[in-house]
């Protein structure tokens, strides 16, 4: 069983929900681009074999220039690929760049989420070896209602509602299979765990 993994780092979002005029991963936090807080964790982790950084094509050169300034050169295990029109298509592009799609393990993380550390990575890596599909989530604190046509249709039972976060981790072949199924059914989901759930595989 492999003790290593690859990671797809998603940075091709437009920052619409955040309300930013530019891609939020390019914003600086303590004089570092936001994406570097996650990128540095994976680059410094010897268990990580490859970082597939999914970026907007028009921002690729800018980010590569920043990375050179941060690390002296482009790290050997860092690969850039272009993002898609939706998160799902960006992850799909990242999956196509994996070195070991058959027997490896892959994590997916949002580059705009800086609060990641080695302990989180280790926890996921240990779990995915056994469970094949694992995610981080926190209990919902707000009451969630289903609304249709401006009218409340249902109030969800808060104790069973969890807010999903990243990183997430999967056996690479399992996540690829989930994406192939989604393509066949022309289904676009919210995040990776949802696609794996559609295979009736526990997450």
Q: Where are the language model's segments positioned?
A:
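Conserved N-terminal catalytic core of the sugar/cofactor nucleotidyltransferase
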Residues: 36-103
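Short aromatic/hydrophobic "clamp" motif used to bind/position activated sugar donors
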Residues: 106-107
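Hydrophobic packing residues within well-ordered alpha-helices of enzyme cores
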Residues: 18, 63-67, 124
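Residues at secondary-structure transition points
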Residues: 21-24, 29, 33, 58, ...
């Amino acid at each position: 069983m492999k003790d290593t993994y690859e990671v797809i780092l998603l940075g091709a979002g437009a920052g619409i929900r955040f309300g930013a005029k530019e891609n939020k991963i390019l914003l600086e936090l303590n004089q570092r681009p936001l994406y570097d807080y996650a990128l540095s964790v994976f680059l410094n982790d010897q268990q990580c074999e490859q970082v597939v950084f999914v970026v907007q094509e028009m921002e690729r050169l800018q980010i590569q220039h920043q990375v050179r300034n941060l690390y002296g050169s482009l790290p050997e295990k860092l690969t850039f690929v272009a993002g898609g029109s939706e998160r799902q298509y960006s992850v799909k592009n990242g999956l196509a760049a994996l070195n070991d799609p058959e027997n490896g393990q892959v994590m997916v993380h949002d580059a705009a989420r800086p609060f990641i550390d080695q302990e989180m990575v280790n926890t996921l890596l240990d779990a995915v070896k056994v469970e094949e599909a694992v995610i981080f989530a926190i209990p919902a604190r707000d009451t969630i209602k289903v609304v249709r046509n401006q009218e409340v249709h249902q109030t969800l039972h808060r104790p069973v509602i969890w807010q999903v976060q990243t990183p997430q981790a999967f056996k690479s072949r399992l996540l690829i299979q989930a994406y192939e199924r989604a393509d066949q059914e022309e289904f676009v989901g919210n995040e990776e765990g949802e696609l794996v759930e559609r295979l009736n595989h526990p997450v």
